[in-house]
Amino acid sequence: MERELESAGLGPVAGVDEAGRGACCGPISIAACILPSDLDGVGLDRLTDSKKLTEKTRERLYDVIRDVAVSYSIIHISAEDIDRFGIQHANVSGMRRAVAALDVQPGYVLTDAVKVPGLPMPHLPVVKGDQMAKCISAASVLAKVSRDRVLRTLDEEFPGYGLASHKGYGTKAHMTAVSLHGGTPYHRYSYKNVAAAHEQWLKGKDRG
């Protein structure tokens, strides 16, 4: 897909993707990536949607992508901003910021099925884009690995929530931990499951 656009004079082509949209703790992480036109022999043969890769493979590809990319950027939007502006706004504005942070301006942007109004160049939302375009796959890996590292750091700061395991998603064990210990500054309190679990902790605290 990227080669067709570049052949039409619309390059360089950047892929953009996010990680953590569906989580209820931690940031949403968004990456933009421009890959070289020729990927032969650079070690990205297994590159696809980050969710279909093992953690070990993602970590290896993360380093390769950063080494070979023409340009890439990774940004994190906090839970506080998500609560303030909403996840959709955080996602779309974050994608604009990630593209703007590239040190090579793309001629065209491909996203994983997300419309991004306000970009200064044309863009195309691609259904299952992280499987269809290598630049989106690369952005997917960059976003996922960088966010996972953030959650592992938060797990060290706030042990007892299992953040390194579930990466901030709303598992039963995670919500039970919030109801027992209360939320952290990195939880998304605008999300009903977090608000309910935190309220349960507050009620128990008051009774105690």
UniProtKB/Swiss-Prot annotation:
Its EC number is 3.1.26.4. GO terms for biological process: DNA replication, removal of RNA primer; mismatch repair. PROSITE patterns: RNASE_H_2 (PS51975). Keywords: Cytoplasm, Endonuclease, Hydrolase, Manganese, Metal-binding, Nuclease. It catalyses: Endonucleolytic cleavage to 5'-phosphomonoester. A divalent metal cation binds at residues 17-18, 112. Endonuclease that specifically degrades the RNA of RNA-DNA hybrids. This is Ribonuclease HII. It comes from Corynebacterium jeikeium (strain K411).
